[in-house]
């Protein structure tokens, strides 16, 4: 019976029976129908939000005291309530509303045209690069070039002029600078100095925090430190000699102001005439260091290069009378080095160079004059730890010039900008023949094709007729360099990555 308060009855009035809803087992309203009401087979119904009409209420016949008609009765009875009855829970209604909204949003998103929703393909963005050319000796000229149409060139890092390339600029004994802007192809450059049959040819290189240069006669040499940065650099120099590390007090903490060049005479610290290697480290800033040597029989300018486990020395000139390998071990453990020569008839191991052992922090020299026998070769040096190497060569007997063959790179794409013509040498250290196509672009745009095939483990030679930008593409990695046509100098070709150092960036046009 209901707990609802009842009114008083009249004398002739019969009490009225009030029906109550049975309590639900799982909430305020029943969601199931008894088997008798549902029939023999249960009907599967889709879930839907509760409507107030779904809640069972006594039909009008019930309220009149008559038996209810099953056809008009609700499936579930509504509990009787008074005026203070609470509101029903409307959670299912909100759930359905949110579901409908989600479907609508999904349909609207699908309706947006694909061209409006898809960001453009990522574009390759390349950063600019600056090369520094160490000061040479005498009247020197800077050759700068790239596959692109122009570069910024000059003798001061903060005062460069845009120049159509390839181009040759006189810089005398100043440092040179070559800069590409963002989006341009990487630059290459070299400095050539020729005077009375004595030639130096040095590549322009990027700044770094460390590097090494090897010299045959420190008593007639100096180091030139170039700081192209906008902040001061603090440089340490360590010399490695035949007996180990040389005491070089005063070569620590050398300060080089922004945009300045500082000359360090090596004879002050080492007046010996045996080969040494100078290790350069910059604690602050990035620098380029070159070494200059002079002697009655020649002169040379050398750019620093990093130590490496594999060192390639390309374009060893033919018909040299002297060939001395200078190798240094910058590590703290004994180092074993193997040498392979890549000659025109195939690879071979030079006599005495099959296994070279070097003490820690020391420099040695190995005579390879007879082993190379005056052949045009490329050398490959390998070790389990980083090493530093150069090949000192001297021309025919009676000549007065010499050269230090410096490290080159192994790559499918090689480039260099030449201030003069010469002999191109390409070496293949792989096990399969490599075909290559090359183009020499001269000032004014004239192009000369240079094509050929380099057998496995051998060296190919060909003429480069004039100054210009040389671009070589091989079917597999090659190493290469150009031997000067006058005097004796060797310029290594630079590896050019098939994609620039820039990162791929996706620009979304919808973002503002």
Give residue ranges: language-model regions:
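Terminal targeting segments of Actinobacterial cell-envelope proteins
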Residues: 1-90
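Conserved functional hotspot residues at active sites or interaction interfaces
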Residues: 85-145, 188-226, 287-330, 387-432, ...
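Hydrophobic alpha-helical membrane segments, chiefly transmembrane helices and signal peptide h-regions
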Residues: 91-112, 278-280, 287, 337-339, ...
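Short acidic, flexible loop segments centered on an aromatic residue
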Residues: 125, 130-131, 225-245, 282-283, ...
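Solvent-exposed, non-transmembrane segments of extracytoplasmic/periplasmic domains
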Residues: 145-209, 216-220, 224-226, 232-241, ...
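Intrinsically disordered, low-complexity Pro/Gly/Ser/Thr-rich segments with frequent PxxP/GP/PP motifs
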Residues: 156-174, 245-273, 347-374, 443-469
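Short, aromatic- and glycine-rich surface loops/edge beta-strands on solvent-exposed regions
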Residues: 174-184, 274-283, 376-384, 465-483
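Solenoidal tandem-repeat scaffolds enriched in leucines and small polar residues
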Residues: 252-343, 350, 354
């Amino acid at each position: 019976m209901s707990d609802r308060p009842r009114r008083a009855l009249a004398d002739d009035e019969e009490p009225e029976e009030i029906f109550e809803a049975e309590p639900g087992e799982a909430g305020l309203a029943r969601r199931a129908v008894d088997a008798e009401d549902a029939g023999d087979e249960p009907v599967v119904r889709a879930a839907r939000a509760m409507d107030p009409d779904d809640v069972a209420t006594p039909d009008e016949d019930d309220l009149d005291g008559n038996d209810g008609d099953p056809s008009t009765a609700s499936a579930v009875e509504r509990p009787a309530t008074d005026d203070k009855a609470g509101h029903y829970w409307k959670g299912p209604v909100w759930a359905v509303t949110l579901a409908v909204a989600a479907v609508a949003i999904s349909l609207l998103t699908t309706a947006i045209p694909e061209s409006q929703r898809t960001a453009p393909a990522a574009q390759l963005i390349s950063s600019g690069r600056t090369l520094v050319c160490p000061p040479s000796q005498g009247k020197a000229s800077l050759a700068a070039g790239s596959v692109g149409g122009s570069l910024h060139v000059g003798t001061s890092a903060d005062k460069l002029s845009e120049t159509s390339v390839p181009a040759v600029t006189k810089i005398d004994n100043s440092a040179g600078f070559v800069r590409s802007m963002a989006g341009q192809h990487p630059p290459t450059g070299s400095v050539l100095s020729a005077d009375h049959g004595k030639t130096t040819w040095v590549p322009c290189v990027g700044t770094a925090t460390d590097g090494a240069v090897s010299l045959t006669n420190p008593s007639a040499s100096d180091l030139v430190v170039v700081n192209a940065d906008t902040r001061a650099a603090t440089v340490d120099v360590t010399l490695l000699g035949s007996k180990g590390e040389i005491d070089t007090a005063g070569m620590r903490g050398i300060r080089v102001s922004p945009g300045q060049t500082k000359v360090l005479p090596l004879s002050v610290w080492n007046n010996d005439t045996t080969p040494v290697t100078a290790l350069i480290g910059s604690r602050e800033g990035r620098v380029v260091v070159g070494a200059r040597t002079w002697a009655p029989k020649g002169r040379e300018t050398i750019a620093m290069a990093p130590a490496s486990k594999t060192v390639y020395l390309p374009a060893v000139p033919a018909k040299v009378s002297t060939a001395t390998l200078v190798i240094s071990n910058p590590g703290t453990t004994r180092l074993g080095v193997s040498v392979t020569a890549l000659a025109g008839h195939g690879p071979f191991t030079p006599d005495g160079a099959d296994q070279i052992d070097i003490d820690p922090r020391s420099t040695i020299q190995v005579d390879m004059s007879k082993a190379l026998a005056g052949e045009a070769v490329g050398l490959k040096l390998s070790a389990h730890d980083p090493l530093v190497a150069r090949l000192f060569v001297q021309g025919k007997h009676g000549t007065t010039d010499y050269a230090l063959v410096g490290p080159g790179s192994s790559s499918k794409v090689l480039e260099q900008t030449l201030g003069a013509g010469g002999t191109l040498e390409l070496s293949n250290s792989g096990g399969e023949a490599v075909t290559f196509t090359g183009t020499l672009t001269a000032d004014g745009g004239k192009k000369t094709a240079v094509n050929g095939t380099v057998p496995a483990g051998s060296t190919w030679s060909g003429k480069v007729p004039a100054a210009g930008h040389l671009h070589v593409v091989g079917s597999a990695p090659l190493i290469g360099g150009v031997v000067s046509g006058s005097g004796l100098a060797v310029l290594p070709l630079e590896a050019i990555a098939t994609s620039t150092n820039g990162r791929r960036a996706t620009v979304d046009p919808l973002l503002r």
